[in-house]
Amino acid sequence: MINLHQPILGTEELDAIAEVFASNWIGLGPRTRTFEAEFAHHLGVDPEQVVFLNSGTAALFLTVQVLDLGPGDDVVLPSISFVAAANAIASSGARPVFCDVDPRTLNPTLDDVARAITPATKAVLLLHYGGSPGEVTAIADFCREKGLMLIEDSACAVASSVHGTACGTFGDLATWSFDAMKILVTGDGGMFYAADPELAHRARRLAYHGLEQMSGFDSAKSSNRWWDIRVEDIGQRLIGNDMTAALGSVQLRKLPEFINRRREIATQYDRLLSDVPGVLLPPTLPDGHVSSHYFYWVQLAPEIRDQVAQQMLERGIYTSYRYPPLHKVPIYRADCKLPSAEDACRRTLLLPLHPSLDDAEVRTVADEFQKAVEHHISQRSPLRK
């Protein structure tokens, strides 16, 4: 099976895990702090602004808690988002308000966001679809003008940027995911970022039961009763650990190589699929925009999309679609019409994209996709007898 996503793990990761085992300390510790500092350097921010957590979902939930969002507050987010984003908002009692997206980029435009703003809006939660930055600069400026907090869900955008500024650092808060299907993997894991170091400090506290000190060793530096606790917030246990952080450090060093290969594969798809009838390829990025190339998406007639996916599966190629419009999900069913999101959901298909793919497999995917499209177009032709 040619997979949609697939991590690359090697001897370097095994060696890093072995070092953690040998240290006899596998929980939160020095390697966690090292990974935070390395990731902060990757973003171009201070290490005190980032917190390594046990998942990207935990990071999303933490953004809502840090901002004290709750009943009576609205948060605008694109309907084409992963469900964890809406869950994080709704869990606080705040209301997710879904906005439409550009039908080709699947990112919201500034106009899409502006139309969804209500008198109760306190924040905007923005996804970078497939790693493409979208109109993040304009949306960040809009949020500042309106006094709204901007949260960037950068799960797809670990290496994305606009004119050298990393996605995730345009707004007030941001999250990244490092699960097994992402570009940089730690098994499970995520990162939280806050532009305001005080919010980052609060997030670190909330991520460990609301405790001001993370361990007895820390407390012993300032008190002769280090077993006493000081609870400043009602928190949870969301922290990462040295095992997953050690993986993250190795994967971060490999990230440029991963991104280069993803870019090569996307370029090959562009060339190999340029003449497939009735198929739209991903839009060209604006000048200064850099994508992480997490998704490679094609768009085709909705009447054949599912049949094409099924035929490719039968040929040993796994494709999929991300993400079903949340305003249509039963638990969030909203009384709104978002035509572009709904149309994109019917037309869009993701092709395999990960550095493990070799050139022969890329050609196989492209060939089988073209065959499937042409077959199902011919089956629907009015000239067919």
Curated annotation (Swiss-Prot):
GO terms for biological process: polysaccharide biosynthetic process. Its cofactor is pyridoxal 5'-phosphate. Signal peptide: none annotated. The keyword Transmembrane helix does not apply. Its EC number is 2.6.1.110. It comes from the Bacteria. CDD domains: AHBA_syn. It holds the Pfam family DegT_DnrJ_EryC1. It catalyses: dTDP-4-amino-2,3,4,6-tetradeoxy-alpha-D-erythro-hexopyranose + 2-oxoglutarate = dTDP-4-dehydro-2,3,6-trideoxy-alpha-D-hexopyranose + L-glutamate. Keywords: Aminotransferase, Pyridoxal phosphate, Transferase. Belongs to the DegT/DnrJ/EryC1 family. Homodimer. Involved in the biosynthesis of forosamine ((4-dimethylamino)-2,3,4,6-tetradeoxy-alpha-D-threo-hexopyranose), a highly deoxygenated sugar component of several bioactive natural products such as the insecticidal spinosyns A and D. It can also use pyruvate, but less efficiently than alpha-ketoglutarate. PANTHER family: DTDP-4-AMINO-4,6-DIDEOXYGALACTOSE TRANSAMINASE, TRANSAMINASE. This is dTDP-4-dehydro-2,3,6-trideoxy-D-glucose 4-aminotransferase.
